[in-house]
Amino acid sequence: MAESYDVIIIGSGPGGYVAAIRASQLGLKTAIVEREHMGGICLNWGCIPTKALLRSAEVLDHANHFKDFGLVLEGSVKPDAKAVVGRSRAVSARLNAGVGFLMKKNKIDIIWGEAKLTKPGEIVVGKSSKPVVEPQHPLPKNVKGEGTYTAKHIIIATGARPRALPGIEPDGKLIWTYFEALKPDALPKSLIVMGSGAIGIEFASFYRSMGVDVTVVEVMPTIMPVEDAEITAIARKQLEKRGLKIFTSAKVTKVEKGAGSITAHVETSDGKVQQITADRMISAVGVQGNIENLGLEALGVKTDRGCVVADGYGKTNVAGIYAIGDVAGPPMLAHKAEHEGVVCVEKIAGLPNVHPTDKGKVPGCTYCNPQVASVGLTEAKAKELGRDIRVGRFSFAANGKAIALGEDQGMVKVIFDKKTGELLGAHMVGAEVTELIQGFVVAMNLETTEEELMHTIFPHPTVSETMKEAVLDAYGRVLNA
């Protein structure tokens, strides 16, 4: 007889494991199915290990500027690729084990294998086709295995994987995805990065800090295309100052593989083609949802462009089947997945006043140097929607703390509705702006007006004062510029 649960979640990434914990907290008998690593891509091969790599890059960048701070370094500092990667993998392993601990603590059953929906309320779990690839990421103890399981509610949280362009498919040797880029045996001397979204530009920034000659090729007119164009123009200037070569409105039309190198044919907006040769290429042209082999078609679950169609509560068109996180479509961000997981489970549990996920208030963060962070509408999008707006800006170059830190290259930009004073969007570039953006996220979520922001006391000296000054600037009241 099949073991029965209230909720079964397929996938243990940020959306899946957080949904499982919240379900258990609400008294629902819960199981989670995983075929590879607890914590999903984010924890094992994405958000967390890349931040560890970028921290090593940041420390190295600081060391190379000791003289600017009156410090004398005897000798030189150089990266040890093996040690840098080793630290990153150790950070990931620690958190991987932490997810297993949280499952045990919250009395959540772990089912190991690949799940397939056979009918509403039932899954069959078979052997995983993706075995654990690192000894520091062992299987949790006392997991359940292959078999049939039933549940009143089944949540699909299977995440996403790299998208590949025809003829330029990653081979794990010369053409990498994030997987190979995270754990190189040695640093290449030169690198082509195809795509300048968060994944592409973060790896470009990391490898440049490590001393690698990096070329970025982006098909759109600006890097980080989802971000505000004024902000990304500042970021591009700083990245190029660090030595990155960036092509926008350009595309890789074909590649030629050699013995230990790869040549990309890059077509620019004027129709000309350049040949760029490098040791390695990273393909970072987007991701697509993991919807295959789940039995969705047989059950009539709607999909669109490689993702499951779900509403703000995670409901699909088939009763009892839900989807959250990357597999449910953009923005494909871990924190959106976590929030969707909580919302979905609270709705299942029948809690009152559960609000659907508002994708317009999901912040985005890119951890390159300089960092970029945002929430809400860009200036271009606000105008496209016909909003009458006020725009405020404030430069880090006029902020005392930023100058003291030696981090005066940055800006905060805010967009308000001229009639209502509603904060429509906030955009930042500069050191640690990924830690600042949450202030505007809270303000937007609470529907804070411009007057309330202008009358909020910000501590001095802090870089966060740039946020208030940007708001003041939108209304002609800026104090320090």
Curated annotation (Swiss-Prot):
It is found in: Cytoplasm. Its EC number is 1.8.1.4. Its cofactor is FAD. One of its GO terms (molecular function) is flavin adenine dinucleotide binding. The active site is a redox-active disulfide bond. NAD(+) binds at G195, S196, G197, A198, I199, E218, A284, V285, G286, V287. FAD binds at E34, R35, E36, H37, M38, G39, G40, I41, C42, K51, D326, A334. InterPro entries: Class-I_Pyr_Nuc-Dis_Oxidored, FAD/NAD-bd_sf, FAD/NAD-binding_dom, FAD/NAD-linked_Rdtase_dimer_sf, Lipoamide_DH, Pyr_nuc-diS_OxRdtase, Pyr_nucl-diS_OxRdtase_dimer, Pyr_OxRdtase_I_AS. It comes from Rhizobium etli (strain ATCC 51251 / DSM 11541 / JCM 21823 / NBRC 15573 / CFN 42). The gene is lpdA. The active site is at H460 (proton acceptor). GO terms for cellular component: cytoplasm. It comes from the Bacteria. Disulfide bonds join C42-C47. This is Dihydrolipoyl dehydrogenase. GO terms for biological process: 2-oxoglutarate metabolic process. Lipoamide dehydrogenase is a component of the alpha-ketoacid dehydrogenase complexes. Keywords: Cytoplasm, Disulfide bond, FAD, Flavoprotein, NAD, Oxidoreductase, Redox-active center. It catalyses: N(6)-[(R)-dihydrolipoyl]-L-lysyl-[protein] + NAD(+) = N(6)-[(R)-lipoyl]-L-lysyl-[protein] + NADH + H(+). Binds 1 FAD per subunit. Its main location: cytoplasm. Belongs to the class-I pyridine nucleotide-disulfide oxidoreductase family. Homodimer. Gene3D superfamilies: 3.30.390.30, FAD/NAD(P)-binding domain.
